[in-house]
Amino acid sequence: MSKLLFLSLALWASRSPGYTETALVALSQPRVQCHASRYPVAVDCSWTPLQAPNSTRSTSFIATYRLGVATQQQSQPCLQRSPQASRCTIPDVHLFSTVPYMLNVTAVHPGGASSSLLAFVAERIIKPDPPEGVRLRTAGQRLQVLWHPPASWPFPDIFSLKYRLRYRRRGASHFRQVGPIEATTFTLRNSKPHAKYCIQVSAQDLTDYGKPSDWSLPGQVESAPHKP
């Protein structure tokens, strides 16, 4: 399939009402995906490595990107650790662009070369990593939950996150959810003394761009300080 046809498909997809950030790939090509867990510092992209048929040689990849679907726009290298790497990084994200990024991943193997294209808007693929350091403090019937923003989220004071909690008492079959919460602490009232709880936290961009993170690891109860 020619690059011109790929570009035509990408332009059509980006203008269609049901447009999502889905790779436009030739038959038997890897599906390329990108996410912005480090917004706005970078967008990270990855794809499934290919093994050329009847060959022991590994496939190498050339990854480039540009802002906009027009072919006359200048392409830049998507940063890879090596030609065989199956992931790359787009640095210095252009914020709130009205045109999509176009990522072109070309697989080069002994049988030839073929390309896959992915069109995306950076804000639509924001997905923070899970919050970190979730911990629990008990005080009678109150259970305080504390956590930190994901370390990979570079500017939490500027590009703020909001959080949701889910919790259940040991033995319960369903989680209850609380949120959204803009602080990094929340107190559950009327908790059962001495009961054990599974509590997890999820993060999302404050302005609802993209998707929520996966749930964090369950919170750990802090040890009471030793009295001298």
Curated annotation (Swiss-Prot):
Intracellular or extracellular location(s): Secreted
GO molecular function: cytokine activity; cytokine receptor activity; interleukin-27 receptor binding
Glycosylation: residue positions: N54, N104
Keyword annotations from UniProtKB, A to Z: Cytokine, Glycoprotein, Repeat, Secreted, Signal
Pfam families the UniProt entry points to: fn3, FN3_IL27B_N
Any one cellular-component term (Gene Ontology): membrane
Broad class of the protein's primary localization: secreted
Residue ranges constituting the Fibronectin type-III domain according to the UniProt record: 26-124, 127-224
This protein's record includes keyword Repeat: yes
Signal peptide location: 1-18
InterPro entries (UniProt xref): FN3_dom (IPR003961), FN3_IL27B_N (IPR056621), FN3_sf (IPR036116), Hematopoietin_rcpt_L_F3_CS (IPR003530), Ig-like_fold (IPR013783), IL11/IL27_subunit_beta (IPR053073)
GO biological process terms on file: T cell proliferation
SUBUNIT field: Heterodimer with IL27/IL27A; not disulfide-linked. This heterodimer is known as interleukin IL-27. Heterodimer with IL12A; not disulfide-linked. This heterodimer is known as interleukin IL-35. Interacts with SQSTM1.
Family stated for the protein in its record: Belongs to the type I cytokine receptor family. Type 3 subfamily.
Function: Associates with IL27 to form the IL-27 interleukin, a heterodimeric cytokine which functions in innate immunity. IL-27 has pro- and anti-inflammatory properties, that can regulate T-helper cell development, suppress T-cell proliferation, stimulate cytotoxic T-cell activity, induce isotype switching in B-cells, and that has diverse effects on innate immune cells. Among its target cells are CD4 T-helper cells which can differentiate in type 1 effector cells (TH1), type 2 effector cells (TH2) and IL17 producing helper T-cells (TH17).
Protein name according to UniProt: Interleukin-27 subunit beta
Species assigned in the record: Mus musculus
Gene name of the record: Ebi3
